[in-house]
Amino acid sequence: MCSQIAIELNDTGVTVRDEFQLLLESPGYIIDCSGQEWIGKEARDRAQLFPNECNNRFWFELAQSQANAVNQSNAKLVLRHLASVWQQVSSNATSVILTVPATFTKTGLGVLLGICKQLAIPVRAMIHHAVLVPRQSDYTGLTIHLDMQLHQTAITLLQERNDEFSVSTVELLDDIGFASIYTTAAEYIAQVFISATRLDPMHDAELEQQLFNSLPVWLEQAQSQGAVQCRLQYQNNTYEAIVDAHGLIAGLKLKLNKIINILLSFDSKQAAIACVPEMIDKQLGFSSYANKHGIMVRRLGLGYHAQQSFLHAKQVISNDAQVYLIKQLPCATLTDPLPRLTNNSLATSHQQATHVLYNHRAYPIEDILYLVEIIGVELQLQNHQSSEAQNALLVIRKKSSQLLIEITNGNCIKVNDQEIKSYAQVFIGDCIRVNDYEEQLMLIKVEQ
């Protein structure tokens, strides 16, 4: 009996479906350590234990391949990952639809198809993720596809014409993905553990692995709870820290704001629906950020693009040896109600920060905190009056229920990439950059 499957690719990993169910999810991780190999979930769950032997960038780098500059080691890792996936799902599969993100270059797609041919994967069609999103019935605004992956985010504006979706504009953010988001969240939680227990989870491989394995659950809990109870096991002891959900979520605000700014840049005067991975909403509360700016959000579940590809199978399947990327398809119309606009996320609550996070150390603000520049030490935070404090670059001061940042001596100070001329009110999650320093300071809340 012949069967058809769809393989959904991005640099987070590989998802495989048939027409009726999810068959496999394999994260884009490989560990090769002294002859021992782990691929997919087994590798991801050991990534912090073997940081030098773990690779999770091969899909990302293959996707960005340029002509005459294909990294063969990345291609070999993609081949090994796909071979592992194909071995598990190939039984009776005689036809495969690939769905791919906007991040793939033509060269990257060519290498990918060559790898599929080498593995005897019978690819019959290849579809751009964005054109698989649903069209909302009786809706005339913008439809935007947001594809957050492990190391990057692709944002695609769709054009609708004659009941078809086609790719109009693509914006790429190579510095925002789940990897950078998890790292930011892990550093915040680690600082809370240090303050509460003196245990630094980032300085022990097994502890760090525990932390990263727990992050998705803790981030989800932070969307509905005021505080998250985090536990780690170390040397037969249990260490516990209560993490303020507001601070944890707000610490990711700068990254989400970059995404929102791109969504608004398309046409802020029109209504917009953003179709996003369910994970970005469940773990980061993306809907509340988007809703605050009038953008509705449609959540796409795991393997959504693979599932939707079956609606177009008869139209796109080709017996021709040549397979081309399909970037235009008839719209699949939804009759569900429009997504609702809400604005009740914990992340939007303005709470007062208690500490400044700088170089992995949390400095208490108390009543006043001076940022000074010391030759040989670079930046230093002080909460007492000193000779250096008289020439402070900036001052963070509590004033009744507000937390204010005051600029001194004509320094260039930016809060969330916006230059501050004299003073400004600041909140949990705000990021401060000073003059030409690469390091940033982040306002956080640490439970006492």
Question: Where do the PLM segments sit?
Answer:
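Forkhead-associated
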Residues: 354-448
